[in-house]
């Protein structure tokens, strides 16, 4: 059986980690052990925050819709209920965009939803 020297494998593994740690501050991008810890932490945070981003955006949309709805004299929960009755199928993202970019159109949506009781 031939002898396997692991120098190349180890160097490749360490280079991969240091490449991922590029841009980190201080020893976090220079020393393998600290770089490895920071890369693992960064990957953990990235995984968690990809899921958290969806919740954050939904909360932002609801906040924006609620603010605009209250300017039009109705609460968010009542607006969503009336929109369901009026069969208006705009999702929260679209409604929030309307509320920010085109307040007149949003007011029209509120008006149409309010009439369908």
From Swiss-Prot:
GO cellular component, one term: ribosome
Disulfide bonds: none
Cleavable signal peptide: none
Listed GO biological process terms: ribosomal large subunit assembly; translation
InterPro entries noted in UniProt: Ribosomal_bL20, RIBOSOMAL_L20_CS, Ribosomal_protein_bL20_C
Domain of life: Bacteria
Keywords from the named record: Ribonucleoprotein, Ribosomal protein, RNA-binding, rRNA-binding
Listed transmembrane segments: none
GO function terms (MF aspect): rRNA binding; structural constituent of ribosome
Family classification: Belongs to the bacterial ribosomal protein bL20 family.
Purpose of the protein: Binds directly to 23S ribosomal RNA and is necessary for the in vitro assembly process of the 50S ribosomal subunit. It is not involved in the protein synthesizing functions of that subunit.
NCBIfam families per record: rplT_bact
Protein name: Large ribosomal subunit protein bL20
Native source organism of the sequence: Gloeothece citriformis (strain PCC 7424)
Gene name, Swiss-Prot/TrEMBL: rplT
């Amino acid at each position: 059986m031939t002898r396997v020297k692991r120098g190349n494998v180890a160097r490749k593994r360490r280079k991969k980690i240091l490449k991922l740690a590029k841009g980190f501050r201080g020893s976090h991008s220079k020393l393998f052990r600290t770089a490895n810890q920071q890369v693992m932490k960064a990957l953990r945070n990235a995984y968690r925050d990809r899921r958290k981003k969806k919740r954050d955006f939904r909360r932002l949309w609801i906040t924006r819709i609620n603010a605009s709805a209250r300017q039009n004299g109705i609460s968010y929960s009542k607006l969503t209920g009336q929109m369901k009755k009026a069969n208006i199928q705009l999702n929260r993202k679209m409604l929030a965009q309307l509320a920010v970019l085109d307040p007149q159109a949003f007011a029209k949506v509120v008006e149409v939803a309010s009439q369908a009781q």
